[in-house]
């Protein structure tokens, strides 16, 4: 541990990073600089990161002393847990170590605490042969009967509509490619999150703006078959747009256009009334700024920092933007998270979105049920729906597939291919009347002669 602390101290002093702000910067720096390939050393660096987060208010020598003391307490608990032949997750060991400091536990009291935690931990574990899938399905499905069918305003952002309740839960478990109301929450890092002017400029750059939004006057001249538009300099300033950028966009889109300061005069390709009206619509709807797939943008102040909420989502594009906090910025589009950040991030998004959807309706579901659903949806390395086009339609058992939906199709295809069902699952054994490999049926009795 002293070696790791020394490396972190050296790295932070060379790069001017004050402990512990932020921990991720110098931990990532060490991992890159030292090319750490030893898994134990990686675990040690992650542990150090968590310890630093818990001692965020300290700096320099005080921080290093606190880190060393906590690490020694964790080692003490680890040794005791090992002697008891218990298997605790790292977080639980760290919580026991924190209890030693908080309550000043003696060795005997620590021994008693570990014994009690072991009993509670083993009691909380799932029994072998338990039908966890059935319990999870019931635990998530039953509260769904109490959920609303309506689309509400997003909590705290009245200007944005976001799908909530049962429709949102269905979107999540169906793994819809196109969700009804995609939205992003964009956070900023450093001092920029407190800079309203900076955030508003970013918001105006993201927000979809059309030429119609910056016009003072607009008219169709039937006499000389032209469309005339006058730009409003005040509106252009309010939206933090550049006059030259607007003109460049207009000249690129329309071939027949005359520009006289703020007056724009357009001519249709053919001198007909129909073409003139089509041209007028095209002029008004010309997009002069914004990001693909993003419409309305709302800026809100949350806990002293400025946050952008959007209608529509383009996470990959926003991550390329300077000043955006890539750790906290997120979207409710699970497939986009999978594309940009990977399958583990998509799994976490499924858990977070499902849990939040339930909690917004005042419903509480044990997160382990939701985690099991998310694990099944992402087990193959891509996000799959729970239905005939996903998990249920891709089961190894012919009878299990046929029992869900499209029975005839599955039986016909299996017959053509000559598939064999080895009857290893639950549903197929229920269908043919055999004991199921679950609970008491998961063990066999051997009679000695």
UniProtKB/Swiss-Prot annotation:
Reaction it catalyzes: RNA(n) + a ribonucleoside 5'-triphosphate = RNA(n+1) + diphosphate
Annotated EC: 2.7.7.6
A Pfam family of this chain: RNA_pol_Rpb1_5
Classification via InterPro entries: DNA-dir_RpoC_beta_prime, RNA_pol_Rpb1_5, RPO1C
Subcellular location: Cytoplasm
One GO MF term: DNA-directed RNA polymerase activity
Listed GO biological process terms: DNA-templated transcription
Keywords, ordered alphabetically: Cytoplasm, DNA-binding, DNA-directed RNA polymerase, Nucleotidyltransferase, Transcription, Transferase
Region (Unknown): 1-68
Region (DNA-directed RNA polymerase subunit Rpo1C) residue spans: 69-449
CDD domains: RNAP_A (cd06528)
GO cellular component: cytoplasm; DNA-directed RNA polymerase complex
Main location: cytoplasm
Top-rank lineage group of the source organism: Archaea
Assembly information from the UniProt record: Part of the RNA polymerase complex.
Physiological role: DNA-dependent RNA polymerase (RNAP) catalyzes the transcription of DNA into RNA using the four ribonucleoside triphosphates as substrates. Forms part of the jaw domain.
Protein family per UniProt: Belongs to the RNA polymerase beta' chain family.
Full protein name: DNA-directed RNA polymerase subunit Rpo1C
Gene name linked to the record: rpo1C
């Amino acid at each position: 541990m002293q070696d790791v602390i020394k490396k972190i101290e050296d790295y932070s002093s060379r790069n001017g990073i004050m402990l512990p702000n932020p921990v991720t910067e110098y931990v990532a720096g060490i991992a890159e600089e030292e090319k750490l390939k030893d898994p134990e050393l990686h675990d040690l660096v992650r542990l150090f990161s968590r310890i630093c987060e818990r001692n965020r208010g300290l700096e320099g020598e005080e921080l290093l002393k606190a880190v060393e003391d906590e690490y020694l307490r964790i080692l003490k608990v680890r040794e005791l847990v090992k002697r008891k032949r218990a298997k605790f997750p790292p977080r639980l060991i760290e919580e026991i170590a924190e209890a030693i400091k908080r309550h000043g536990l003696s060795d005997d009291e620590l021994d008693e605490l570990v014994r009690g935690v072991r009993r509670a931990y083993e009691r909380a574990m799932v029994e072998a042969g338990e039908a966890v899938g059935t319990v999870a399905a019931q635990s998530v499905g039953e509260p769904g009967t109490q959920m609303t069918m309506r689309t509400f305003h997003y909590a705290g952002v009245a200007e944005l509509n976001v799908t909530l309740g049962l429709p949102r839960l269905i979107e999540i478990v169906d793994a819809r490619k196109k969700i009804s109301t995609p939205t992003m929450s964009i956070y900023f890092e450093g001092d920029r999150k407190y800079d309203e002017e900076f955030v508003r400029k970013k918001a105006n750059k993201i927000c979809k703006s059309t030429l119609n939004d910056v016009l003072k006057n607009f008219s169709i001249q039937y006499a000389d078959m032209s469309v005339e538009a006058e730009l409003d300099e005040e509106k252009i300033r309010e939206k933090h747009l550049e006059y030259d950028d607007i003109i460049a966009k207009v000249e690129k889109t329309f071939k027949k256009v005359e520009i006289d300061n703020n007056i724009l005069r357009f001519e249709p390709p053919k001198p007909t009334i129909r073409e003139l009206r089509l041209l007028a619509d095209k002029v008004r709807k010309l997009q002069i700024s914004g990001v693909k797939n993003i419409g309305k943008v709302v800026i809100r102040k949350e806990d002293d920092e400025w946050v952008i909420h959007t209608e529509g989502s383009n996470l990959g594009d926003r991550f390329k933007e300077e000043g955006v906090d890539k750790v906290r910025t997120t979207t409710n589009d699970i497939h986009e998270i999978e594309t940009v950040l990977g399958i583990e991030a998509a799994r976490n998004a499924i858990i977070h979105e499902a849990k939040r959807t339930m909690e917004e309706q005042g419903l509480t579901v044990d997160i382990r049920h939701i985690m099991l659903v998310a694990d099944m949806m992402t087990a193959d390395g891509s996000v799959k729906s729970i239905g005939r086009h996903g998990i249920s339609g891709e089961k190894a058992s012919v009878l299990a597939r046929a029992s869900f939906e499209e029975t005839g199709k599955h039986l016909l295809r299996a017959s053509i291919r000559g598939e064999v069902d080895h009857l290893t699952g639950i549903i197929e054994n229920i269908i043919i009347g055999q004991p199921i490999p679950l609970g008491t049926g998961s063990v066999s009795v051997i009679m000695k002669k």
